[in-house]
């Protein structure tokens, strides 16, 4: 074949994969069903912060608006961990978010870590499972809350259950940003 892999090599790869799948399937069938007690295993621990402490408006600090606070938090995360990515609808360098809240992040972190996605909410939310499985820390944005509905299936069925269903092997570490209430309404679809 043009990329240097011939049919016999592909057949060998397929045979190895098929054997692995069959072996894993047999192993899974032999496992016991989950018990009621296992429902509390492989869940994320609650935060140690159980009550608000400290000053919300320190005297030595200038007031900030919510969008700036979110930008500062994302920047802080991305500076502290190279595995953090920001992606979603119009968050890349050209626009930087519909409210321009991420305008400087693409310049600071580059197009490999801050980038646009297609207008497909289910993909944006669902892709965080795969990104997390390979060790990345996705921060994703759906353009407006009006458009979140296709992504909710992924949030409810994949993101929220991944850690439990994989017995802690694929904990999904993600942040989902969904702006709401700024102005106007978009209806159920773009």
Where do the model's predicted regions map?
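Generic detector of well-ordered alpha-helical segments enriched in charged/polar residues
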Residues: 1, 11-14, 18, 22, ...
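Terminal amphipathic helices with adjacent charged low-complexity linkers/tails
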Residues: 15-58
């Amino acid at each position: 074949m043009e990329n240097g892999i011939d049919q016999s090599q592909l057949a060998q790869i397929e045979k190895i994969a098929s054997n692995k799948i069959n072996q894993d399937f047999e192993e899974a069938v032999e496992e016991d069903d989950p018990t009621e007690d296992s429902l509390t295993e492989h869940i994320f621990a609650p935060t140690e912060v159980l009550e608000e402490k400290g000053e919300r408006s320190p005297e030595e600090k200038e007031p900030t608006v919510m969008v700036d606070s979110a930008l500062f938090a994302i920047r802080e995360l991305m500076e502290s961990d190279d595995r953090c990515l920001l992606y979603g609808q119009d968050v890349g360098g050209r626009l930087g978010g519909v409210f321009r809240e991420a305008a400087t992040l693409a310049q600071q972190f580059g197009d490999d870590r801050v980038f646009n996605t297609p207008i497909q909410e289910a993909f944006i939310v669902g892709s965080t499972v795969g990104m997390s499985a390979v060790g990345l820390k996705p921060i994703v944005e759906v353009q407006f809350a009006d458009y979140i509905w296709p992504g909710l299936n992924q949030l409810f069925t994949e993101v929220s259950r991944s850690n439990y269903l994989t017995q802690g092997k694929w904990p999904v570490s993600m942040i989902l940003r969904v702006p709401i209430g700024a102005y106007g309404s978009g209806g159920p679809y773009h």
